[in-house]
C-alpha cells in the first residue's frame, strides 16, 4: 500500500470582488490569507491601522469575495481516495472544484475534509471559494429568529448568530474589521488509509514516581497495525505495536514510565516534552505517520472549603505544587490572524514568561489559537486557561447552530488536548454576567437540559450541556468551568466561589485602586487599568507621524484609537485622583498614564497575593490582568502594546510576581479624644508589612525598614523590624504593623515620609525591596531630584540608577527598540543604587530618564 501523499495547495491563489462585475483577479499577498491583507497589498485599501482608515474600509466586510487557484494532481491509485482538507475558512464559504460544489461552510472554527476523487483531474483543477459577508448573513439570521432575545455587549448582535471570531465586529479595545478568506492552510491528500487522530491519556501517580500513558491512534479506512514510539530528547523511551480494531479503527497501547520527566510551570521545574509517534502499517508498508508532543504532569483545580472564611478555594495544583496563578488575559495578537508568524507567537509568550507570569487566559471572543501559541506555552511553562469562543452576549440555540457548535467544540478540543499547558476549559466569557444584567432566566436548581432551550437564555444548553459533554468525553481529566466568571450557579460577583471579573476599578463603582484589598476574590480572572501605548506606537498610527497635527492626547485621531466607552472620563478620573499631570508634552502625558496603570496593577497583585496564606487559607488563588496584548495600535488595558513594546506596568507586575517580594500598605485611623468632640481628633497613620515567598523553600531573612523625608531627602528612620524571620514556602507571611516613622507626631509629617522595606538574607544580599509613598501622590511635594544618575556599566550589561532625594517612578527610555530593560519604573531613595539589567546596549546607546514631578 502506498503512503499517504500530502500536497499543500498554497500556490497560484488569486482573489477578486465577486459582487463587482468589472473586478479583476489579482494575486494574493500570502497564503493562508484574508481579504484585507490582499487588498492592502495591492493598494486598494489604506492600512486600517493608520489614522481613521478603519472607517474607509467598512465596505470590505459587506462585499462578497472570491478566491481561486489552479493546481495539478498526481494520479489516484486504485482503491485510494483524494481529499481536500480545509483547516479554516472565514466564514460563509461556498467551495467549487471543477464546476462542482463540494462544500458549504458557515463556521470559521471548523476544519473540513471533502472527498474529491470523482471530481479531480490530472491537470487544470480549478478550486474556487466564494465568501459571503458575515455581517449581512448574520443580520439575516437575526431576522429569521425574531423570538430570540438578541442582545450583547460590544459589536453588533449579528455576531451572536455567526460562528466567527467575535472581536471582528469590534470590541472596546479593537476596530471593526470583518474579514473573510482562507485563513488556515488548504491541502490535497491522496491515500488508501491514513491516521486521523493521535492522543494520549496520561496519569501521573500522586507520588510523582510513575506515569501511565495510554496512547490511541485512529485510522481511516483499512490497514493492519500501528507502531507507537515514545521518545524524550531524541532518545527512545518505549515502542510497541498494536492491531487496529476492525470496527472502531482504533489501536491503543499503554506504557508505564518509571521516574518520568515531569512538566512543570515556569520557575517550578523544567518543561520536558515527550514525542509520541504513530506509524500506520499495512503489511510491511509504512502508510502514514502522525506525531504529537506531550508533557507528563498532574494538574488539578482545587475547590474546597477554607479555614476562617466562607466559600471555597479556586486554585491550580501542578505536580502537587500549589500555584499562585498570576498572569494575564490574551486576545488575538492581530486583527489579521494569518500574518502572525510562529516567531511572533513565541516572542509574545516569552514576554509573558519573562514577566514572572504563570498563566495566560485565551479569551472567548477571539479564536482557538494556532498550534504555535500553545507550543510556546508548552516550551516555556505557561499554564493556559482556555475559553470556548463565546463572549458578552445572549447566544441563540437553534438546532443547526447547536450541531455546528458541537462539531466546533469536538474538533478544537481534539486539536488541542495534547498540550500540557492547557489546565482548564471554560464555556464562555461573561455570558452569565450578561444573563444577570438583563434578567434572563436562570434557575441553577433546574437540571432538565432540554427545558433550558425553551427559556430566554437558551445558551445555557451550550455551556452546561454541549461543551460540558464534549470535555467530559474528550478531556475527562481537565477541569471544565461553565463560564468566566462563574461560581457554582451563584451570582457571578460572589467573591467567595469560583472566579470573578473585578471591574469595580475602571468600570462599575469606579473604586480607588488603593482599595483592591476589599475587592479580592478566590480567583480574579479579569481586572485592569488603561494606559497609552509607547509614543513610538502613537507616532506609527498617526498619518504624519511626529509631524501630525493630531499628535496630542485629546485629538480626534488619538481618541479614535481608544475604543472603550467613556475612556476620556475614566482616564481623567484616575489621573486626577492620583497624580499631578499635564497633557503636554505628549511624552510625559503617556508616561503619567503608564505610571497610573503600573501603580494600579501592582497594587492589585501586591494586595491579592497577600491573601495566598498557606494550605487551607488560599483566599486568593490567582489574578489575571486584562490584558496581555493588543490586536492593533491602541490605547487599551494591555501591558504590552501591538508592537511588543512593554508598557511600564509590565515591569511593576513582574516585580510583584517575583519569587520573593515584600509589601506595605498604609492605613489612616481617626481617634476622637472623647465621644462628642470633632475638634480634638488624633490621626494615626500605620503601615502593615508582609512578605510573599512563592518559592518551594523556607527562607530566613531580616526585614529592614528605612524612611526619608521626601522634601529634604533626609533619612529619618532605619531599623531591623524582624530579625531571622522565617518565610514559609509558597505563601505570604505577616511581618509587622507600626506607625509611620515620623520625627514629630500630630503635625502631618506622615504625608512627606517615604518608607522602604527590604528583605535581606543572612549573607546580606537584598532579596526584595519595595518603596511605599504617601497617597495620593498628587499631594506629595516632590522635589527635583538632586544628582539623578542613570548610567550604563562599563560592559553595557546594566544601568545603575541613583539619586540624593527620593524619586518616584524613574522610567528608563531609549530610542533604540533593540535596547531592552529587565526592569523599569523604579522608585529611588538616597544611599542606594538600583541596578537594572539591559540587553542590546553599546557604546553609542543613550539612556534617558523620566520621573514623576519632572514637569
Swiss-Prot record:
In terms of pH, the activity is described as: Optimum pH is 5.3. Active from pH 4.2 to 6.5.
Biological process (GO) annotations?
A: glycoprotein catabolic process; polysaccharide catabolic process
- Got any disulfides in this one, which pairs? none
Q: Which SUPFAM superfamilies match?
A: (Trans)glycosidases, beta-Galactosidase/glucuronidase domain, Galactose-binding domain-like
Q: Origin, by domain of life?
A: Eukaryota
The pathway entry for this protein reads as: Glycan metabolism; N-glycan degradation
Q: Which Pfam families match?
A: Glyco_hydro_2, Glyco_hydro_2_N2, Ig_mannosidase, Mannosidase_ig
Where in or outside the cell it occurs: the entry states:
Secreted
Gene3D superfamilies membership = Galactose-binding domain-like, Glycosidases, Immunoglobulins
Q: Recorded GO terms, molecular function?
A: beta-mannosidase activity
**GO CC annotation terms, alphabetical:** extracellular region
Q: Which UniProt keywords apply?
A: Carbohydrate metabolism, Glycoprotein, Glycosidase, Hydrolase, Polysaccharide degradation, Secreted
Q: What is its main location?
A: secreted
Q: Where is the active site?
A: 430
Reactions mediated catalytically: Hydrolysis of terminal, non-reducing beta-D-mannose residues in beta-D-mannosides
Q: What temperature dependence does the UniProt record describe?
A: Optimum temperature is 40 degrees Celsius.
Which positions are glycosylated? 98, 693, 730
Class of enzymatic activity (EC top level): hydrolase
Q: What is its EC number?
A: 3.2.1.25
* Role summary: Exoglycosidase that cleaves the single beta-linked mannose residue from the non-reducing end of beta-mannosidic oligosaccharides of various complexity and length. Prefers mannobiose over mannotriose. Is also severely restricted by galactosyl substitutions at the +1 subsite. Has no activity against polymeric mannan.
Family in the record: Belongs to the glycosyl hydrolase 2 family. Beta-mannosidase B subfamily.
Subunit-level organization: Homodimer.
Q: What is this protein called?
A: Beta-mannosidase B
Amino acid at each position: 500500500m502506498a503512503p499517504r501523499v500530502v500536497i499543500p495547495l498554497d500556490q497560484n491563489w488569486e482573489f477578486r470582488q465577486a459582487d463587482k462585475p468589472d473586478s479583476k483577479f489579482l494575486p494574493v499577498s500570502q497564503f493562508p490569507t484574508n481579504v484585507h491583507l490582499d487588498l492592502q497589498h495591492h493598494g486598494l485599501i489604506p492600512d486600517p491601522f493608520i489614522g481613521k482608515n478603519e472607517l474607509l474600509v467598512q465596505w470590505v466586510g459587506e462585499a462578497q469575495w472570491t478566491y481561486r487557484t489552479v493546481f495539478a494532481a498526481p494520479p489516484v491509485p486504485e482503491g485510494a481516495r483524494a481529499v481536500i482538507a480545509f483547516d479554516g475558512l472565514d466564514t460563509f464559504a461556498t467551495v467549487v472544484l471543477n464546476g462542482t460544489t463540494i462544500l458549504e461552510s458557515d463556521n470559521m472554527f471548523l476544519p473540513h475534509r471533502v472527498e474529491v476523487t470523482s471530481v479531480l483531474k490530472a491537470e487544470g483543477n480549478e478550486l474556487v471559494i466564494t465568501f459571503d459577508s458575515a455581517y449581512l448573513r448574520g443580520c439575516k439570521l437575526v431576522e429569521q429568529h425574531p423570538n430570540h432575545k438578541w442582545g450583547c455587549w460590544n459589536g453588533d448582535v449579528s455576531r451572536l448568530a455567526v460562528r466567527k471570531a467575535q472581536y471582528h465586529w469590534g470590541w472596546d479595545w479593537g476596530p471593526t474589521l470583518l474579514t473573510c478568506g482562507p485563513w488556515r492552510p488548504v491541502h490535497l491528500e491522496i491515500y488508501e488509509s491514513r491516521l486521523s487522530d493521535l492522543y494520549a491519556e496520561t496519569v501521573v501517580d500522586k507520588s510523582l514516581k510513575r506515569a501511565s500513558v495510554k496512547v490511541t491512534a485512529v485510522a481511516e479506512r483499512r490497514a493492519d497495525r500501528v507502531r507507537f514510539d515514545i521518545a524524550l530528547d531524541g532518545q527512545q523511551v518505549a515502542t510497541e505495536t498494536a492491531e487496529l480494531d476492525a470496527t472502531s479503527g482504533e489501536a491503543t497501547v499503554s506504557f508505564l514510565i518509571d521516574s518520568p520527566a515531569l512538566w512543570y510551570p515556569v520557575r517550578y521545574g523544567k518543561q520536558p516534552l515527550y514525542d509520541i509517534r504513530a506509524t500506520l502499517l499495512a503489511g510491511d508498508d509504512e502508510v502514514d505517520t502522525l506525531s504529537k508532543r506531550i508533557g507528563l504532569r498532574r494538574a488539578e483545580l482545587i475547590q474546597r472549603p477554607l479555614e476562617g472564611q466562607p466559600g471555597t478555594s479556586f486554585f491550580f495544583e501542578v505536580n502537587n505544587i500549589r500555584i499562585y496563578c498570576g498572569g494575564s488575559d490574551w486576545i488575538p495578537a492581530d486583527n489579521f490572524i494569518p500574518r502572525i508568524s510562529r516567531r511572533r507567537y513565541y516572542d509574545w509568550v516569552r514576554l509573558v514568561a519573562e514577566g514572572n507570569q504563570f498563566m495566560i487566559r485565551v479569551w472567548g471572543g477571539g479564536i482557538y489559537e494556532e498550534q504555535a501559541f500553545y507550543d510556546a506555552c508548552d516550551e516555556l511553562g505557561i499554564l493556559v486557561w482556555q475559553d470556548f469562543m463565546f463572549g458578552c452576549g445572549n447566544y441563540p440555540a437553534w438546532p443547526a447552530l447547536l450541531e455546528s457548535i458541537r462539531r466546533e467544540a469536538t474538533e478544537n478540543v481534539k486539536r488541542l488536548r495534547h498540550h500540557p499547558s492547557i489546565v482548564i476549559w471554560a464555556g464562555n466569557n461573561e455570558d452569565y454576567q450578561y444573563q444577570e444584567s438583563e434578567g434572563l432566566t436562570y434557575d441553577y436548581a433546574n437540571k432538565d437540559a432540554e427545558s433550558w432551550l425553551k427559556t430566554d437564555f437558551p445558551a445555557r444548553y451550550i455551556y452546561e450541556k454541549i461543551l460540558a459533554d464534549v470535555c467530559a468525553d474528550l478531556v475527562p481529566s481537565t477541569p471544565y468551568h461553565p463560564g468566566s466568571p462563574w461560581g457554582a450557579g451563584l451570582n457571578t460577583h460572589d467573591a467567595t466561589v469560583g472566579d470573578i471579573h473585578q471591574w469595580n476599578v475602571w468600570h462599575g463603582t469606579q473604586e480607588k485602586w488603593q482599595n483592591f484589598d476589599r475587592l479580592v476574590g478566590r480567583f480574579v480572572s479579569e481586572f485592569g487599568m488603561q494606559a497609552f501605548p509607547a509614543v513610538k506606537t502613537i507616532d506609527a498610527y498617526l498619518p504624519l507621524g511626529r509631524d501630525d497635527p493630531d499628535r496630542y492626547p485629546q485629538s480626534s485621531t488619538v481618541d479614535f484609537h481608544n475604543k472603550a466607552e467613556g475612556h476620556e472620563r475614566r482616564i481623567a478620573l484616575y489621573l486626577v485622583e492620583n497624580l499631578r499631570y499635564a497633557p503636554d508634552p505628549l511624552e510625559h502625558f503617556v508616561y503619567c498614564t503608564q505610571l497610573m496603570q503600573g501603580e494600579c496593577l501592582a497594587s492589585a497583585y501586591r494586595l491579592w497575593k497577600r491573601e495566598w496564606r498557606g494550605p487551607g487559607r488560599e483566599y486568593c488563588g490567582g489574578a489575571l490582568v486584562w490584558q496581555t496584548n493588543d490586536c492593533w495600535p491602541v490605547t487599551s488595558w494591555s501591558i504590552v502594546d501591538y508592537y511588543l513594546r512593554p508598557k511600564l506596568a509590565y515591569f511593576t507586575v513582574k516585580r510583584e510576581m517575583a519569587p520573593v517580594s515584600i509589601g506595605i500598605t498604609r492605613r489612616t485611623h481617626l481617634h476622637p479624644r472623647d465621644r462628642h468632640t470633632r475638634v480634638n481628633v488624633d490621626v494615626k497613620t500605620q503601615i502593615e508589612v508582609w512578605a510573599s515567598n512563592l518559592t518551594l523553600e523556607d527562607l530566613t531573612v531580616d526585614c529592614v525598614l528605612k524612611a526619608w523625608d521626601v522634601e529634604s531627602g533626609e533619612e529619618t528612620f532605619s531599623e531591623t523590624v524582624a530579625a531571622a524571620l522565617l518565610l514559609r514556602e509558597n505563601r505570604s507571611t505577616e511581618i509587622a504593623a507600626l506607625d509611620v516613622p515620623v520625627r514629630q507626631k500630630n503635625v502631618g509629617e506622615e504625608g512627606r515620609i517615604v518608607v522602604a522595606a527590604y528583605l535581606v538574607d543572612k549573607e546580606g544580599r537584598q532579596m526584595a525591596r519595595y518603596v511605599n509613598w504617601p497617597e495620593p501622590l498628587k499631594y506629595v511635594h516632590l522635589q527635583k531630584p538632586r544628582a539623578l544618575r542613570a548610567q550604563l556599566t562599563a560592559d553595557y550589561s546594566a544601568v545603575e540608577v541613583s539619586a540624593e532625594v527620593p524619586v518616584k517612578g524613574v522610567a528608563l527610555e531609549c530610542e533604540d527598540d533593540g535596547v531592552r530593560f529587565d526592569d523599569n519604573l523604579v522608585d529611588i531613595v538616597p544611599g542606594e543604587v538600583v541596578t537594572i539589567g539591559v540587553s542590546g546596549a553599546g557604546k553609542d546607546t543613550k539612556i534617558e530618564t523620566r520621573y514623576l514631578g519632572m514637569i
